[in-house]
Amino acid sequence: FALGRASGDGNAWVHWALWSQGSNLVDAKDQVIINSPETAKALEYCKALSDTFVAGTASWNDAFNNKAFLESQVSLTNNGVSIYAAAKAAAAKGDAKAKEVMDDMNHSLWPVGPAGKPTEFHIAYPMMVMKYSKVPNACKAFMSFMLEAENYNKWLEDAVAYLTHPLNAYDANPVWKTDPKLSMLKDVSRRTLTAGGLGSVGEKAAAALADFVMLDMVASVCTGRASIKDAIGVAERQAKRIYR
């Protein structure tokens, strides 16, 4: 798992790891609560997990785990379906090694930890109309057009399960039925939390994510750069500068 500043895979796994233990950056009122026994326990778990990692994860970005898995350097990582899709595409062109990887691999949902409920963090790509738009109604009409079944179903199929849907009706899309290795992915929109965790969704949550507050805290412990206490203290100070 990436310990470098991997905005997708790195942020995804550390948020799951922390949330699954009951650790949160802020509470429902956006008050910083990262300095907690749950965070300390989560960091102990992350450190133990990182001791099993291959060398180099401290500098991994979002591409490194794909490469490592496809080259059989690792047998477990967190990702969307891009690794599987790459192996499948290469296998279709006659790559025997890629076919071996494709046939042998599978996907799983994130485990539920002591928190007792799914605490996954999947990346959301929002559709937004900016206030400065000169044609807001046209933008809204396009969004409505895109989400109509005759348009969205085709788009969803072409995304080959890399992207999932926010509307229940699209559970019936063929992409979730044609390949058993992709079927469980249709539920990720139901299972994911937002970047704010317990807190609100907005600029502050986005800033904490962009500044890698949680990821850097985990990485500093896993790499031995900081003790658990010191790492939590740094994250707490960073968070309080953002949430004020």
Residue ranges of model-derived segments:
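A bilobed periplasmic-binding-protein/Venus flytrap-type ligand-binding module shared by bacterial periplasmic
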Residues: 122-135
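Short helix-initiation/N-cap motifs at beta->coil->alpha
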Residues: 57-71
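Alpha-to-beta junction loops
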Residues: 71-80
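Glycine-centered hinge/linker elements that transmit conformational signals in sensory
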Residues: 29-58, 106, 110
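Extracytoplasmic/periplasmic solute-binding protein
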Residues: 1-32, 38, 74
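A ligand-binding cleft/hinge motif common to bilobed small-molecule-binding domains
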Residues: 81-99
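Long, aromatic- and glycine/proline-rich binding clefts that accommodate carbohydrate-like moieties
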Residues: 103-109, 157-213, 218-220
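Beta->alpha turn/N-cap motifs
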Residues: 62, 79-84, 125
